[in-house]
Amino acid sequence: LHIFFLHEVSYQKKPIFEMHEFPERLNLLGHRITFLQFDEGFQARREMRSPSSETISGRVYSNAKIHLITPWQFGMPSLDRYLATIVTPFVTLRKLLNDRPDVIVSYSVPTSGWQTLILSKILRIPFVYRAIDVSHKIRKSRFNWLVRLAERFVLRNADVVSVNNPAMARYAIEVMDTRRPVEFNAPPLDLSFAVRPTDQTRSKVFAKYGLEPEDKVLLYLGSFFYFSGLGSFLQKFAPVLKRREDFKFLLVGGGEQEDELKSLAHTLGVSDQVIFAGFVRFIDIWPIIGAANVALNPMTPSDVSHFALPNKVIQYLAMGTTVISTRLEGLESVFGGCDELILENDYARMAQIAEREMLATRPKSIPAAIERFEAEASTKSFETMLSFAAKREDPR
């Protein structure tokens, strides 16, 4: 199959998750992959960037080949996102006409998703919407109501809606207001990466981040979004850090909250124990997770977090690391009942649990629920769904 993926983020800069893993694994199975990105954060000092088309090596699997398309951008991040809704369809239409795919898979909604859906109807190309979050809740904007309309349009008119967890399926069905089935396809987890670190590897991780051998590490991995809950948790965890000098809070990633979190750590007097590691390579996250005593997912409970399935939690659990998380519907629908996942919405109580678990000495264990994300099986499920969609004579 020729599969045309699109998303409203940068393929080359975004931390790795299923938008990289599915296309690259499908390419390794023999499918031709085109990916339309939006290079968020691109800045140009002198001139706009014309549409580009290039073949790149995979970010997860270097032997995979992805044909990457980048539309016009003017180098003004605050303006480019809005302009992209207008200019991207022209690039997309040209590509669809000149190199017609068998099926389109969209992670995108407002930037390029609804426009590509309209084009797919005109050209009679099957359109799959991969719903992994609630689009109109991701960013705070005066235009959220427009994003909500676009999301409803995409959900109600896509030929197939594929979700990554049962809670997201319930949300999609409610918005679709139809009995049309929703496909559940688990995101792929390549367990070949999830190797327990040796003592030597653990020592290297500790040395890299200035940790002492006797330190206990609480890990947060991912983006620092406004709904991450990191600030609220840190305020409650600071007294624990002050009481326990051997406790360290390691934050791997970055985002819009980073400066605010650094300032908060300084104000609370714990900046020496809160370590900002920045983004790391995909291959390097696994020994970090394995070296941590406890991992954290303090996302503020809301629509955007309830219906998502945080990739970091899957990675934490795959390494046998105990996870403390707010109680989120998506997580509970998949991992509910797992002893390795502790759910708590009160941040003060969460800080107490973190202290208890960081001092615990029980061996690490991997929950059985992780098996449903096994990469080969999940990719095969996704491939089967796409093959079925591509063979429809009348995608309407």
Can you name each region flagged by the protein language model?
Residues L1-T55, V240, L328, E393-R396:
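N-terminal subdomain of nucleotide-sugar transferases
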Residues F4, E212-F237, S378:
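Conserved donor-binding/catalytic core segment of Leloir-type glycosyltransferases
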Residues Q37, R148-R202, V274-F276:
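Donor nucleotide-sugar binding/catalytic pocket of nucleotide-sugar-dependent glycosyltransferases
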Residues G337-A348, E355-A360:
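Conserved acidic donor-binding segment of nucleotide-sugar-dependent glycosyltransferases
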Residues D259-D284:
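Nucleotide-activated donor-binding/catalytic signature segment of Leloir-type glycosyltransferases, i.e.
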